Amino acid sequence: MSNSKIYFEDRSIVTPGDLIAEGDFQIPWSPYYYKIGNKYYSSITGLIEVKENLFEIVPLEGHRYIPKVGDTVIGLIEDVEIYGWVLDIKSPYSAYLPASSFLGRPVSPGEDLRRYLNLGDYVIAKIETYDRTINPILSIKGKGLGRVSSGIVIDIPPVKVPRVIGKNRSMLDTLTSETGCEILVAQNGRILANCATKMIEEALVEAIQIIEKESHIKGLTEKIRKFLREKLGETKNDSATKTEANT
């Protein structure tokens, strides 16, 4: 690795064809770069993240979710079949959830699966199988997986997921601590949030929209913290004023 070199600093913007690095790097395959010999080139316009002699390219916009085994996703039921459900996971490929995985038993002949999951329902699941030759197969075996029964689902471009989470979960921790909401960020660009009030929920949505639009800006975590404190401070003041007016 001593002869390897990365030509961009952390959080620099790269464009298609840029020579990113040269040498021997043990990094996972990604559609966002290509390799010629021992040289790595960017295939998109994005942000490069450098850490401990490794790099990752995060697209700035566009791009659908590329399934990866083990990822947690939030899928939307778009079809009910005899032995399972077809889900939209914001990918070029629809995903399939076998009923046996959801029910924990084989499907009975003539059983109506709409009793359990119907069109428009959201499901938290993991990508169990995917190899580019078949559509992703989902599983809900595991803690916290299954049908979404409460909260709101917020859609963002999948490429913005790393920014919403932040380095060492810094952005996600800020969103959680400042709002008190329970927040799950799925890898396919859907966020499940359970908040105490509608006003807090709306403030969270606004904060996420800011992150989405300004994901390339440094100091964004602190900006979001200040925004939420000001926004929720205004909300609390408005609530107090209304309470005083009614007494």
UniProtKB/Swiss-Prot annotation:
CDD domains associated with the record: KH-I_Rrp4_prokar (cd22524), S1_Rrp4 (cd05789)
Location of this chain's protein in the cell: Cytoplasm
Organism of this sequence: Sulfurisphaera tokodaii (strain DSM 16993 / JCM 10545 / NBRC 100140 / 7)
Protein's UniProt name: Exosome complex component Rrp4
PROSITE patterns per UniProt: KH_TYPE_1, S1
Subunit structure: Component of the archaeal exosome complex. Forms a trimer of Rrp4 and/or Csl4 subunits. The trimer associates with a hexameric ring-like arrangement composed of 3 Rrp41-Rrp42 heterodimers.
Family statement drawn from the similarity comment of this UniProt entry: Belongs to the RRP4 family.
Function noted in UniProt: Non-catalytic component of the exosome, which is a complex involved in RNA degradation. Increases the RNA binding and the efficiency of RNA degradation. Confers strong poly(A) specificity to the exosome.
UniProtKB keywords: Cytoplasm, Exosome, RNA-binding
UniProt GO cellular component terms: cytoplasm; exosome (RNase complex)
Main location class: cytoplasm
GO biological process per UniProt: CUT catabolic process; exonucleolytic trimming to generate mature 3'-end of 5.8S rRNA from tricistronic rRNA transcript (SSU-rRNA, 5.8S rRNA, LSU-rRNA); poly(A)-dependent snoRNA 3'-end processing; RNA catabolic process; U4 snRNA 3'-end processing
Occurrences of domain S1 motif (ranges): 70-143
Cytoplasm as UniProt keyword: yes
InterPro entries: Exosome_RNA_bind1/RRP40/RRP4 (IPR026699), KH_dom (IPR004087), KH_dom_type_1 (IPR004088), KH_dom_type_1_sf (IPR036612), NA-bd_OB-fold (IPR012340), Rrp4 (IPR023474), RRP4_N (IPR054371), RRP4_S1 (IPR048565)
SUPFAM superfamilies: Eukaryotic type KH-domain (KH-domain type I), Nucleic acid-binding proteins, Ribosomal L27 protein-like
Ranges where the KH domain occurs: 149-211
Gene3D superfamilies named among the record's database cross-references: 2.40.50.100, K Homology domain, type 1, Nucleic acid-binding proteins
UniProt GO molecular function: poly(A) binding
